[in-house]
Design a protein with these regions (language model features):
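Single-stranded nucleic acid-binding surfaces, predominantly the OB-fold ssDNA-binding core
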Residues: 1-97
């Protein structure tokens, strides 16, 4: 089976590099990805995709990108097993390559 996702969009927030208790770098953010099609008489719709980067990828993203930057992400879609505080299901791109 194949689980490969490629996304291109703009980073929607300021990036923050965090470190876990075991010393691993991590950052999480969302990107705004416009849909390819627009129904006649309607505005283009945008999807907001949550991304998590670990280790050197996290450090690279925080060093060279910022809010509003266009970024391409390749990885695997992984569904999370919890709900956010607002009750929505969360999804993220795991094992991402920037």
């Amino acid at each position: 089976m194949l689980n490969r996702v490629i996304l291109m969009g703009r980073i929607t927030q300021e990036l923050e590099l965090k470190t876990t208790a075991s010393g691993i770098s991590v950052t999480s953010f969302s990107i705004a990805v416009d849909r390819n099609y627009v129904k006649q008489g309607e505005q283009r719709q945008t999807d907001f995709i949550n991304i998590v980067c670990w280790r050197q990828q996290a450090e690279f993203v925080c060093r060279y990108f910022g809010k509003g930057s266009m970024i391409a992400i390749e990885g695997q879609l992984q569904s999370r097993t919890y709900q956010a505080k607002d009750g929505t299901n969360r999804y993220e791109i795991g094992r991402a390559h920037v």
